[in-house]
Amino acid sequence: MKLLEPGTEIDGFSVLECIHSGGMAHIYRVEYAVGAPNPGFPLAMKIPRMTAGDGAENIVSFEVELQILPTLTGPHVPRFVAAGDLERLPYLVMEYCSGHTLQHWLDADERPDVATIARLGAAMGRAAHSLHQQNVCHLDLKPGNVLFTHDNHAVLLDFGLSCHAHYPDLLAEELRRAVGSPAWIAPEQVVGVRGDPRSDIFAIGVMLYELATGELPFGAPSTQGGLRQRLWMAPVPPRQYRPDLPEWLQETILRCLEPEAAKRHPSAAHLAFDLAHPDQVPITERGQRQHGLGLRTQFKRWIKAVG
């Protein structure tokens, strides 16, 4: 579908401008047409790409978001407004949230200080916990999908790869393969396990690692073999890149990135608490680590992962 021109009207909504044109959807600022009631907040319309060359994932992801977004409430998600008919013109209208995505801090010339990293991480943890309390796992948390408002709330965006505990998992049923963004996908997602809230904790850990070091802990692999390495490989300790980082922060980040979900924080609320109360973080070998794990330990992890 070609981009909509400003002034185009769709089901009582008037297009103002295109604010994002991505591989899976176009997003527009819109407003109610003349004579319609004012909702009291700005609006955005998301229209999935559905040209002949686009895969089934685009439309399935739209169906997933259409299924999940209307069920969500609270300050950490955009408010749902309306949806278009799937057969005629599929679209979602939701609250437009202003602020900066996490990418804003990653694009800065200097790495943020420890207090900023902890503040951003705690906000992400609280937002993820709110989502998990509503029986939803995001499963595609990454810098472009986390927005920070001017009052320092984290707002989670794009629920096209999400999973609701009480609804059919359309992506698992239709695609039957791991789906997610390669740099941030959790090890269990790589092997097809969806619906574990601790997968979102892993993704937050990847973002904290990149905030702290400017590096991705597992790179951005493009092959299944590259993705599977995170099932056993340990990332370079953040303090090796940045010695000024405190042990408690490295401890917290590396705990998020444990290949076994059971070894991560038990909930996103626990992660948020640790980031807000560094004096209460118990320091283990993870926090004191100066170098990557030895070959023997890596081999044991590999045996456990493949066995």
Question: Model-flagged regions — what are they?
Answer:
Residues K46-R49:
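Conserved beta3-strand ATP-binding lysine motif
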Residues A52-T71:
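AlphaC helix of the eukaryotic protein kinase fold
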Residues A83:
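Activation-segment/catalytic-loop signature of the eukaryotic protein kinase fold
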Residues E87-T101, W105:
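Conserved short submotifs of the Hanks-type protein kinase catalytic core
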Residues L120-G121:
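Activation segment signature within eukaryotic-like protein kinase domains
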Residues R126-V136:
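Protein kinase catalytic-loop region centered on the HRD/HxD motif
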Residues A183-I283:
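C-terminal lobe helix-coil module of Hanks-type protein kinase domains
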